[in-house]
Amino acid sequence: MFGRRKSTEPKAMKQDTDSITELVRRSLDVAELKYTYSNATNHFSIVFMGDDLPINVNLVVDDLTIRFVSHLDLKAKPEKYKDVAWELNGINKRLRFGAFYLDPDDGMISFEYSFPYVEANPSTDFILAFMKMFVGTVDEHDGDLKNLAESVSASRNAMYG
């Protein structure tokens, strides 16, 4: 609470990586979603069908957060990076959460949001509702994004691009 003296005792984590990974797995199973899981990078990959394009979603569980990452199959040309970044900024300022970004190394556009679970108690319903909002946001803006960058087939790994 604001104004209260902070305790010098470290807070115990409510959740750990293994329990959150299992919660994500349970959530996907309850929703009967097809997914792949990588033990090496501790991430789940799911493909949703948007209005006109598939939406690849990766849920990456680390020691503090669940990262929702969608690497879009859209690539900007180097000479358009400045314009694309400006347009992405315009989209981002209207979003309630998350951000679209341009990778300057390869020109690919992605959308990402991280949920810090350390002091929270997320549920199956929360994971599924959050994923629905995440996918809905990507789907809502993919038309604008297709006007900024060209479509390519380049699905990337959530951890290593």
Protein language model regions, located:
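Long, contiguous binding/interaction regions
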Residues: K132-G136
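Short, highly charged C-terminal tails/helix-capping segments
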Residues: K146-G161
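Hydrophobic residues embedded in beta-strands of well-ordered beta-sheets
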Residues: N42-F44, L64-I66, G107-I109
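Short, internal acidic amphipathic alpha-helical interface segments
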Residues: V69-E112
